[in-house]
Amino acid sequence: MRFKIKKCPKCGEYTLKETCPLCGEKTKLAHPPKFSPEDPYGEYRRRLKKETLGIGVKK
């Protein structure tokens, strides 16, 4: 079963459409991806998050 409900990242409106009816922004899936214990991209995702937040990054 595919998820159909989407959420606008700009205004937070939930919809079934590809674009937000209120602001016209492209919507994204409202559900997180499935959890996998063998997360193949976990290391990269955590590294990106640390870099984005500036944690443990040498400047």
Swiss-Prot record:
Keyword rRNA processing: yes
Signal peptide per UniProt: none
Gene Ontology molecular-function annotations: snoRNA binding
Keywords: Ribonucleoprotein, Ribosome biogenesis, rRNA processing
Top-level taxonomic group: Archaea
BP GO terms, sorted: pseudouridine synthesis; rRNA processing
GO cellular component, one term: ribonucleoprotein complex
UniProt cross-references to InterPro entries, sorted A to Z: H/ACA_rnp_Nop10 (IPR007264), H/ACA_rnp_Nop10_sf (IPR036756), Nop10_arc-typ (IPR023532)
Family assignment from sequence similarity: Belongs to the NOP10 family.
Function of the molecule: Involved in ribosome biogenesis; more specifically in 18S rRNA pseudouridylation and in cleavage of pre-rRNA.
Protein name as annotated: Ribosome biogenesis protein Nop10
Species of origin: Thermococcus sibiricus (strain DSM 12597 / MM 739)
